[in-house]
Structures are given as structure tokens and as C-alpha cells.
């Protein structure tokens, strides 16, 4: 297969797909370990590479298991932290809070969600999406 025929995900095409109306917004992103590009780069790194050109990345949010899968055991809550390299908050949505609080959303203009799910009712990711949408109303 030639390089030109490779599958590209929307994450791989952000510069051409990012809406002009959202240019330079303060962005938060809800991500998990399967949030990756076609080259298997985690979405947080892809988003950071566009920080300051398409949007301003201000916060990350992680569901059950954490945004990078740091808590793989089932039903293990985790606490938020400050990203050690980017100095932005990484909020836990599977700890003290299950949905973003007004304080977490303060200063954000948009919340991007990139989480794959199998569609089974016992998976928590679909509920995390719902709770994020409700918090952003």
C-alpha cells in the first residue's frame, strides 16, 4: 500500500478539519489510552503539537483508568494532577468527581472528546461523555 493510500483519522487531519469558528479557543480534551492517531501517537501529543496555532490547550480530562491508562485495575479511582511537562491540569473524571465541575470548565471555550467505546452498558466511557455534555450545557 502506498503512503498516499493510508487511512487518516480526523486527529491526523486537524489543520484542515479544525473549524474556523473555533480557531484559538481555550480547549479542554477528554481522552483515554485508545485516543490515538493513525501513527499510534496519543491524542494529547497530537493536540499539544497544534497548541497555539489551532487552539490553546488548557486542560486534559481522563475517564476511568486515566487519560493514559495509569489505573488499569477495575474500579480504581484516580486523582487529578498537573501535567509535568505542559503545566496544565489533568482532571480525573473517575475520582472525587464523575463529571466536570464548573471550576474545571472555567476558562474553557470548547471540550473535545475522543474516546472509543464498545457500546456495552457496563462500560463507563459513554456515561463520561454524557456527563461532560451535561456539564457543558
Per-range role (PLM):
Residues 117-129:
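Glycine/threonine-rich flexible loop motifs
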Residues 73-108, 120:
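Glycine-rich oxoanion-binding loops at beta->alpha junctions
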Residues 35, 66, 116-119:
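Short glycine-rich anion-binding loops that position phosphate/pyrophosphate groups of nucleotides
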Residues 6-56:
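N-terminal phosphate-binding or glycine-rich loops at protein starts, especially the Walker A/P-loop
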Residues 56-67:
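Short internal beta-strands
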Residues 43-50, 128-136:
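Catalytic-core regions built around general acid/base machinery
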Residues 25, 108-109:
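Short, well-ordered alpha-helix to beta-strand connector turns
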Amino acid at each position: 500500500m502506498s503512503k498516499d493510500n493510508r487511512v487518516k483519522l480526523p486527529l491526523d487531519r486537524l489543520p484542515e478539519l479544525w473549524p474556523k469558528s473555533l480557531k484559538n479557543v481555550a480547549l479542554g480534551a477528554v481522552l483515554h489510552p485508545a485516543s490515538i492517531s493513525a501513527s499510534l501517537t496519543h491524542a494529547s501529543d497530537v493536540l499539544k503539537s497544534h497548541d497555539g496555532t489551532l487552539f490553546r490547550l488548557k486542560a486534559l480530562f481522563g475517564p476511568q483508568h486515566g487519560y493514559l491508562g495509569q489505573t488499569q485495575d477495575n474500579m480504581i479511582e484516580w486523582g487529578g494532577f498537573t501535567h509535568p511537562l505542559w503545566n496544565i491540569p489533568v482532571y480525573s473524571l473517575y475520582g472525587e468527581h464523575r463529571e466536570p465541575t464548573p471550576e474545571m470548565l472555567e476558562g474553557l471555550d470548547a471540550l473535545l472528546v475522543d474516546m472509543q467505546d464498545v457500546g456495552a452498558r457496563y462500560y463507563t466511557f459513554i456515561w463520561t461523555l454524557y456527563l461532560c455534555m451535561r456539564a457543558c450545557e
